[in-house]
Each structure stands twice: as C-alpha cells, then as structure tokens.
Amino acid sequence: MRSLGEKARFDELELLIQNTPIEKLKETLKSTMTRSEGITYWNYLLRGFNPESKDALAKRFECVRSFMDGLSSTELSYKQTFDLITRLSQDLATFPSEQLAWIVEHCMDGIRQGDAKCVGWKDLLPDALSLLLARPRFLLNGISIDGMEFRDTTVRSIATMQWPASILTPIADMFKTMNLSSGEIVTVLNKFSGALQELSPMELPALCFQLFSMCSTASQLIIPLLALEKYFHRNYYKRLFSDMCSNSTNLDSIDLFSDKELREAEETILHHLNYCTMYKLTEKHLAIMLRNFLHMPDVILTPFMLSAIISMTSINRDPESARISHSILLPFLRNVIKNNEEERTLADYSVWYRDTLQRKQVDLQQVLTVLIDQNKDGKDVITPGLVHLVFYLLKSQSPKMHTLAITFLTKFIRKRFIFGQGIIKLISEWMIVYQEQNQFSECLTLLSVADTYTVSECMKPIQSVLEHMQWLSGEQSMRMMNFILPLLKISNRVRDALIDVLCKAMSSSGIQKRRMAIYGFCMILKQLNNSNAVRQTSSATSFCTQHSISGYSIMTQNTLGSRSNPQRNFDMLTLEIIGMLRNCLQQQFDIRCSLYENLQRAVELNAKLVPHVLQVIDWHFRSFFDTPSAEDAGDDLDTVFRIRYDQLVSSSDDQHMEIQLKDNLGKLIQFVANCLAVFDRAPSGYDTREMNRLMSFCVDRMVANRLPLEEITPPATHLKCALVLQQLNIIEGIICHLLLKSKPQNNAVCQILPLFNQHCKLLESLKALSDASKKAHKQLKQTAKNNSTSTCNLTLNGVPVKTMCTQPDNIWDLAILDKLLHLLLDDVVAFAAPEKTVLLRSNEPLVRYVLSVTASRVESIRLEPDYKQLAYSKRTFKQLTDITKVIYERCIQRLPELWKNFDMQSAALATQCFSECLKTAHETYSKKFEDFVKSFDLASIKGSRNKEVVYTIQDVLDDFMTEYGTDDSICKNEFVSKLPVYLLESLEILLDHIDYQDRAATESYTWLLNFCSKNEILNSEMGLVHRMLFVQRQKTHLGPFFDSVARQLGHVLGVQNEDAPSESVELTLKSISTVTIESCLQHLYAAIQKQLNDVDYFVTKANNLNYKCQVVPEIDQIYWRGNLDSMDRSICTQIIHISRTLLVLTNVCIPLGSLMDGLMKLLIQHYTCLKSLTKHYISSYTSDTSIENIKSTKFELLLRAVGKQLPANIYELITYIEANTLDEEAQQHTKKRKVQAERAKVLRETRLIPKVIMVIEDFNKHIILLSKKTKSKNRLTDYLHLGTMRDFDIKSTDLRAAIERSISDGRNISTEDSNAEDRDEDEDENENVEEDDDAQSTTYPEDLEEKEDECLVIEKKEERRRRRAPSSEAEDPQPKRKRGRKAAEQLEAEDEEQVEEEQPETTLKLRRNKKVEPKTKRSVAIKKPEEQPSHESRTSKRSKGPADKQTAEPAKVDLCVPEVPAEKKKPQPSRRLGIPRTLRK
C-alpha cells in the first residue's frame, strides 16, 4: 500500500484495498497506529476507498470504527493523535449522515470515559457536527431527524453530562471551535465556572485561555472571571487576609496548593486575559457590562478582579502612548472605590444599613497592600494600570480618595523605587498645573519624608519646581517648598538650588515673594541640627552633628580654608542666611511680622540658632527704646525710659487719618522673650544683659504706671486707634516675657495682674475711641463733601480702610496660653509658687479673657493656610492636647462647681474653649482623634475606673437643666445661654467618633431620649439635641420611631384632618415646643432624607445583585437569590416605616415656605425611590414566580400601606397650600406695584406641586406595568389611589393652535338664524364634555390596560410655556365651572393680554392615547371615517357659541369684576394641580 501510494498509483491502490479482507485491514491498521509510519498507512488506506462504491464505504466505515476503538485503547502521543484525526477529518465530507452520527456518538462516549490521554474527539466532533448541520433529514435509530436538531441535541447533551476534571481543557477547546450561539456559550461557561473550582492551579491557565477565547462579548467574559475570583479567594486570598488581620499565623495548617503555584497561575491567567481580549473587547464594551457591578464593591474590589480589570485597560497595555484621560475603566474603578468608602461611612451611621448589607465592607488598604507585595515579587502585569488608577484617585475631589492614593504611593515607592522618578515627575507637573488643589503638594511632601533618597534623585522635577517657584504666587510656592525641605538633609545640590531661588525671591518687589523667602530660609535654619545624612561627602566630618545639611554652600565654599571644624560650617551657613534675613528688619510691616513668626518657630526647634539670632535682633530691639546705656544710667527709678512710638506708627497728614504702620513691638517683645528663654537653658555665645535690662524696664515702668503713653483720649483719630492697639500688644508681649522667665523663686507672676489691669483700661479706651470714631469719620466725610479742597482718606500703609478702630488681635500663641491656663486653673504649677497665684486665679476678668483668647486661638488653627501643614505638626497637636486636658480636668469635670462658686460666664467660656478644641481636633486631626481623647481623658484608657468624657458631659448637662432649665432670665442671657449649646456640640463630636459597637453609643441614645423627654427647651439653639437624637437612633436602633416624632409635631402645629386615625402617642418629647419646632422639623427632614438615600442606594445595589444572579453558576444562584430576597424584604420594610412617617407629616399644618418646600422635596424623593423599587421588581421577577416573591418581600404590604392613604393626604395637603396661598381678600386690596411680587410668591410656594403629582402618576404607571407582568388574581392596582390627574403638563403650542383654529372657524359661521338653538346645543355639548371628563378620570387604571402604549414626546424648552390665570379670574365671584373645550377657549382669549411665564422644566411629557386625550380638534381627526361627518357638524355648531360670547362679554367682565367683592368661600382647588374629584363642590 505504501509503495502504490508513494507512486501515486491510486487505481491499483483502490483495487488492492477492495480485494483485501476487512479483518486484514483492521489488523494492519491496529499494528501500525503506534509506529511512526502509522499516519502514512492511515493516509493511503483512506485514499484507497472509492467514495462512489457502497461496499468501499462500508469497508471504510468498519476501518474507521476500528480506528476509533484503537484510539481509545492505544496510548499515542498528542502529535500522532492529532495527525490521525486531522487526516480523517479531511474525508468526513464523504461520509453518509448515519456514519457521521455514529462518529459523534462515539466521541461523546469518549468524553464520558474522561481519559485525558485519549482526547482525539475534541478535533473530530466539531467537524462532524458542522457537516451534519448542512445535511438533509436522516434516520437515526429509526427516527427521522435533521442536522440542526441533531446538533442542538448533541450540544445540550454534552452540556448536561458530568465532565471529568481531567478533560476540562480539551472540552473547552472543542467548544471553542463549535461555533456556539450566545445562549449556548453562556450555558457552557456556567458549566465550566462550577467545574473549574476543583482544578489545581497548574491546570487553570490552559483552561482559562480556552474560555477567554470562547467569549465574544463582555457579558460572557464576566462569567469565568467571577468563577476565578471565587477560586482564588477560597484557596488563597481568604487565608491571606485572615493572616493580615490576626497577630499570629497558623503555620501548622496544610493547604491543598502552595502560594507560589497559585500566584504563578494567577499571573499567567492575567496574561491570557489581556491577550484574548486585546482585539475583541474595548474598554467601552467592558464598562457597559461592569456598570452592573458599580454598587457591588465586594465583587470588583478583590485582588484578582481588580487585577483582571486593570489588565484590560489601554493604559496598562500601552502606558507610553495611551492617554489616561481616554480611559473608561479607570474612572469606573474610581467610582466603585468611592462607593465602597461611602458604604463604610454609611454603615457607621445606620444599623439598618449594616443589617441589610449582610457583609463587611471591603478594606481597600488591605487589597492595595496585597497588590504592592505581589508587584514587589516581580509580577508586573498590572503595574502601569495600577499606578494610573492611583493617579485617578489622587486627581479626584474627595479627601478620602486622596488619602488612599497617598498611602499607596508611599508604600509603593518604598518597595518599587525604580518607578519613583516617573511618579515624582507626573505629580510635580500636576502640582504646578493644578495650583488650587493641595493634594499634589501634600503627596510629594509625604513621599519626600517616607523615601527621601528616592525623591532626592529626581533632580529634573525638583529643578522644574524650583524654576516655577520664581513666578508662582508666594503661598503656592510655600506649599510647593514643603516637599523640598526634607531633601536638604542629604542633597547639597538641592540645598544650593533652593538657596539660590530664595535669594532671588528676597530681592523681589512683591511682598508675598519675600514672605516666601523668609519662610524658606527659616525652614532651612530649623533643620540645620538634623544629622541623619551620610551621602553628602566621603570625609569623616559628614558624620558630625552640625555638618548634617551644611556642607558648603555656594557663598561659603570660597571663604573656608579648612574642613576640620564642622561647627564652622554651621556658623557660616547660619550667618549667611541670617544676614539676608537682617534686611527684612528695614522692610514693610507684614515682612517684619512674618520674620518674627518664622524665626521664633526656628529657634524653638533649633536652640543652637539663638546666639546668631540675638546678635541680629539686639540692635533692632534697642532702637525702639529711648534710654541711656547701662554704664551711663544711674538709679533705675530716675533713668529716662521711653518707647519710641514714632518708630512703630506715624501719620502723614495733619488730621492723623493716613497712617503708616511700621512694626509691632508687642510681637517683637514676645519673639525676644522666647529667644531669651531658650538662651537661658544654655547661656553662652552672646551677652544678653542689655536686652534683659530693657525688658525689666518695660515691666517695672508698666507695672508702676510710669511708662509714658501717647494721648489716646477722644476725639478719635486713626493714629490714636493704632497707638492703642500697639500698647495692647506691648502689654501682651510683656506678659509673655514674665511667664517665660517665671520661677518659684522670683515674683514674675505677681506682676501679671497689674499689667492686665492696664490692659483692661486700654480696652475701655479703645471702646470709647471706637464709639467716637464713627462720628468723627462721618464728620470728616461731610466736611470733604462741602469743601472741595479738603479730602477724607482713611488709609493704612496706603491701603484704604473702612473703619478707624478694629478689633484688637491678641498675640499670644498656644504655648503661652497653655502656661496661662495652668497658672489660672491648676492648684500647683512648676514655674510659680502657689501663694503667688492666688490673686490671679481669683480674678474673674483675667480668667474670662484668657479663656476667650484661647477659644479664638484654637479656632484659628482650622483657618491656617495649607502650606503650614498643621495637620502633620506634632508640636501643634501636643499643645492642643495640653490645652484640652487642663480645660477638661479643671473646668468641664467641675463645671457645676465653677458656675456656682466662681462665675457663670467663665463656665460658659470654658465650655466654648473645650468645644473649639474638639472641633479643631475633629477637622484637623481626624485620624488622631482617638489619641487626642486619650490624652486628656484618662477614663478612655482600658482599666480606668474614672467616668468617660461622654458621661461627664451628660451629667453636667443634666445638672444645668435641673438648675437653670426653666429659668428664663438665664436662658435669655446672650452669653450664658450658650453654655448648654457648647456642651451639646462637644457631645455631638465625641459621639461621632464612638463606634456603633461601643456600649457608650447605645447608652448615649438612651440618655438623649430621656433628656428630650423630661426637659422643656427654652433656647432655640439647643434644638440641635434633636439632630443628635435622630442620628444616634439610626446608628443604634431599628424599627419605627420618626412617625411618633411627626405625630408629636402635629400636636404642636396642629393637623389638617382631626378625624384621621392616629395611634396613641407613646413617645413624648418635652423638648419639642414652639421654640424648637422649626429646627426639629428640619432635622427630621434630614433624617428621613438620609433614610431615603440609603434605600435608593440599596435599590441600585439590588439591581446589581439581580444581574449577578444571572451570571453565576446554577449551584450559586440559590444562595445569591436568597440574598436578593432578603435585601428586598429589608428595603420594603424600611420604606414602610418612611411612608408612615410621611403619612403623619402630610397631615400636619406645616407653615408655608422653606419648611413646606422641604416636605414636598421629601415626597418627590420618596416616590422617585418607590418608582425605582418598582422598576427593580419589573426587571427581577418573571411572571411565574413573581407574585410569591412580591408577597415574600413585603412589596404588596408596602403598596397597601402607601398606595391609597398617602396620595389622599398629599391631595389634601395641596388644598391646604392653595388655601393659605390664594388669600382673596388680600388680593383685592393689593396695590398694582405689588402684583408681580404676589405672583412670584404664589409661584414660589406652589412650584413643587406639579412635580409631586408627576412622580405619583409615574409611580402608578409602573405599578400598572408590574401588575400586568404578575397576572395575579389580586391585582396590585387595587391598592392604588385613583388619581384624577391627566396630562397636566400639556403641550401649550398644540393647545393654542387648536383654540385659534376653533375661534377662526366659529367667526366664519353666521349665527343670526340659530343663535338660541346653538346656545342650547352648546350647553348640552358642554355638559357632555363634563361627563366625558368624569368618565375619563374613572377609566383609570382598569381601562388603561386595554389602551395603546404611551409614547414619550420631548419638547424644546423654548416651546414649553404656560399662561398664568389673570388676577380677575381669582376675584370672580361666580362659581367656577369645570373646564371643557369652551372654557378652555374663553380662558385662552382672556390670557392673551397677560405675560407668559415659563413652566418648570420637565424634559419628558406624558402623552395619553385616544381615550385619555382632551377633546380637541386634533384628536377628532383620528376618528373612524363613518363617524367624522356628524362629528364635524357638531364641531361647527359648538364653535359658534363661544365666538359670539367672546364678542359680547369682555366689556361686561372688565367693568364688574374689580368692583364686586368676592364672597369668602372655601377655596376651589384647581384641577391643574391634580385635586381628587371627591374634594370638589
């Protein structure tokens, strides 16, 4: 056979095979299959059968059967099997259908056997099925069947059989080539999704490649991805997250697979996913599918799923050319992360939210940490996309996103520093471009601190930032400078470049630039003492303390001859910088103050600067005092000592109104006092005796009242006011000096009280000048107005100001205030003798003043500019905690004793100060708030028996309300009434940081409920206790509550329907009264709105969960469907509670205005949420099981509670609004000039009514659609309120055109012969119109089901206008008739003289079909042909009457309407507003 085949003698070959017995052929075939020449024999054997001979075909089929049996029993290599099957496939087209069907059945038997070594069927079965697909009908086992039916049956049979795990990959390869339909692909993928859970990691990549290749759409791709996510979570990530959350790891556990195998499999799968989807699926296709999981962070934010999505982004595939702004998946991931963070926040404040969520929120920090660790091991498949995702988070507007991004980048750069330069370059560019956003500079600063070496190597970005600092604003430059400062410790190049930029800024003409230079130089001075650098030089001096950042700057390299003295480097660099700062002492007022502030901070943090700073500041300080030197002076009492106020402030005009403010001596004294205090710790390097002598002179002369002061008595001038402010700051600076030098051995603190008395006198003088300055300023303006030659300019340093006297600004910083508070409040202090502090502690004005200044200073921390970065300042945090501790321990814990035995105003100021401390810690140090509380409240530490701060405040509030709660005089005091308000604000902040699992959270709610139940509040500002009560209620308790609150509001405000059934009011809150009713109502609105927002979020989440139920394998569908039903039940229960609350609120007589608008907005949001829930049920449940699911999820119960009662109350509420809006008697006497204002008021108070009715009707429409789908006996529409509203938002242009056509037709018809007859017919027709109108309103909703589907018509905004009824219409004493066609025409004729006003914007208009549309001429045109003639005759007669009536009646109406007073009747509700017909008269 081989010889004949090789010589192409095929005729002889056919004859040979024909003459050879079949057994011989089978035996030869079986013996040659395993040999290398087996494919040759098989080829010639198949070639030798004549396809036109039946005997040859039968013999060939026997050989094929033997061949197929041999494949199952003989072990062949994959190449041999593939070659043999491929050769057989070439001749399959010549096989009869019955033989092909046998081959298919044999292949299926091979699949059932599950032998991984015999998988030839995977290549043979698809070809055989494709051939059968085109064949005509054939007999199979005696049954006639066509190819398509056989193919579908075969695929269905394969999909339902049990697949052995060993042949899953060949089966997937077979399905990939079978050209399956979309439904079959989904079925097969679901089958594989359940089967792959049992595979080993080494078997997964090959199978996943086949599955990914099989997917042609994104909705198919998500099926294997969800299965793989489940696989890796169960086998790897679940254990990994458990180990990360626990302190110990179970090293004795034996896992099925190693972590290395799982990670390698995951990495390979991600590579296949990227390759298989690169050209088939775009980001847009994936985003359309993935948006169904937008509100399911637990599905998307897992390590595998996150990696899979990132691997399919264009920015990950081609990071060099792809633009991040064109990405679609990265914004999607950002939104998912945002939703997850919102879920974490919402779960902390809602127990219903936590119970409905049924799981914990995703800890994204853990997920990102895992991805960083995997990336560190060399798994770089998703590195570009992951980094750009973090960039998206950084560029968002959410602070939480910024925190996540900065934390990730900090960890990522530490472990993958090779990517550092690219990251630093991009962020630095964004920092320059987006100057109004602070997150970029903050990120660079934290990166610079976390990995200084990596950032210091990015010289090009640093140089670019330094170049831009020269032309950017000063504040922006200071913000950008913060990330460069940590680099100065290890980089001489950066240091010298920064100094060069600062030198240029110092010589700039702009004040902001020079302030930036001062800030930068002082930051350099502050860091000169740090010594953690080794890289800057190779000499031994690099390890010395003072040589840390100094090195050799550009200006000192030429002056140094030896490097053996590192102290010399420090001194020279310091002197260089201070020498440049010395020039600031001769510059403007703002520059000097900025220098004092920044130098003081540098000195406090680097004490070795003090000798150099004192040398510079000494002569400047002496220049403000006129006194002889210490050698020339005699007795101190007789020595001349005077302050040179002309060096501080001067006037450039005779009237002393244009002043020049040169310096602030008080701030200078405070700065010098701090320098001297630091110098006294190590007094060497400079002679400070003269400075101390001048300070002593200031103290002694001021205490003895012998220091000459400028004239500050009225009449007031601008100069006098400025001098008083200077003297106040001088006294404050002297007090700082006394506090800093005070010791138990000296009498420094004894001199504080006389100085404060002088301070109080100056404040009184300033108040007198302030009163006189207003009159003086007014007189000067009048003089300037009368005399053209004189001018009145009130300027400060050339800048016009509005007032002469401004509020004094205290100069004490937090450190001074801390010492003052300890001095005044503590029994014993380390820096003063106890007997010397008695007078100070008993002085009420001093205590009040210090507490007031402390409160304002602590508040100012929150207002500091971003560049100071106080949120990261440990020093400021320590000072804040110290102040809070002394206030809490000495005032708050003893507050009843304080207001009884000392002063009520001081107690109120103490509570204000404590509240400001908590607010500042809450806003500025939110991450450290727990540490902040532990620093002053020792009871918060475990094991302490003291009472926690929350309970302390509650007890103090109880004491205050018991003693003063009913005292009107105390509660009406403008200042003292703030005491309980400040305590409540403090309690609210503390409760905000208490976890819902903490016992204090539940007990605080109980206390708040008791507080509101037993205390009547006389102060409206204390109404915030209701907000606290409502928030804690939602945080800790489930069930109905707010309906009881709404019922009690009805007792205070009154109700519309007294006969409305109401339950007994179990909850009685005395705190709800006429004083607090408005704030309580607003807080109740906020609570209900939060509940509606939560429900709306969960409706969307339920839609996402429903989609997931459709794509998970069947084995998991029961579990997820159970979760969906549970979520639906929880949603319906919550909406029932909300609806009952709104049912009560709509019956309350709420005042019109913002309170009524708030209720209407709640109703709109409520019905919008109900519509979303109804749409969810429409899409989630099939008609077979829907009614059972609807009953089990309480949706039917919800309709019973909401469907009829709430709309009826809303319509009555609309009547109530109209009755209070349209006051007929007031309109009669309204002047013409107030008409427009009254109309605007009416529109403003009724503008939300059409929207409320629209959402109700929209909800009813969706319930009708759901009722049709369920096809249940108990129709859901039976629970609906039968509204009377139809087409309330009609298309005005069509209506106007129809009316004009009717009028023009009526004028062309003669009315002389049949005027009376036509009138009678017109009246009859009008009655018919009314009857049709009534019938129209009663056909809903039963007849509406038989009508055509509604169509949505989009109108242009310019065309949607509505005419307003004229004022005469409201004043018409005649009863109104229902609007038929005639009334509509008359109304249009009267409205043509009025100004058209735009309707509220509504994009989509509901257009009803024939049975619901108004009877206009346009609707007549669609009648049947046989009905049109008679109808047209009726139309011509009907249009005649209105035309005549319009020509006769206008004069009569114009004359009689203004003079006839309207009778006081019950207001007639307008049908335009959708009032129920049962309310009409």
Swiss-Prot record:
Residues 1306-1481 are annotated as: Disordered. One of its GO terms (molecular function) is DNA polymerase binding. Residues 1314-1335, 1342-1352, 1387-1400 have a biased composition (Acidic residues). It is found in: Membrane. The keyword DNA repair applies. It comes from the Eukaryota. It is a multi-pass membrane protein. Residues 1423-1447 have a biased composition (Basic and acidic residues). Its main location: membrane. SUPFAM superfamilies: ARM repeat. GO terms for cellular component: membrane. The keyword DNA repair applies. InterPro entries: ARM-type_fold, FANCI, FANCI_HD2, FANCI_S1, FANCI_S2, FANCI_S3, FANCI_S4. The chain crosses the membrane at residues 211-228, 299-315. Keywords: DNA damage, DNA repair, Membrane, Transmembrane, Transmembrane helix. One of its GO terms (biological process) is DNA repair. Belongs to the Fanconi anemia group I protein family. Plays an essential role in the repair of DNA double-strand breaks by homologous recombination and in the repair of interstrand DNA cross-links (ICLs) by promoting Fancd2 monoubiquitination by Fancl and participating in recruitment to DNA repair sites. Homodimer. Part of a Fanci-Fancd2 heterodimeric complex that binds and scans dsDNA for DNA damage. Interacts with Fancl (via C-terminus). This is Fanconi anemia group I protein homolog. It comes from Drosophila melanogaster. The gene is Fanci.
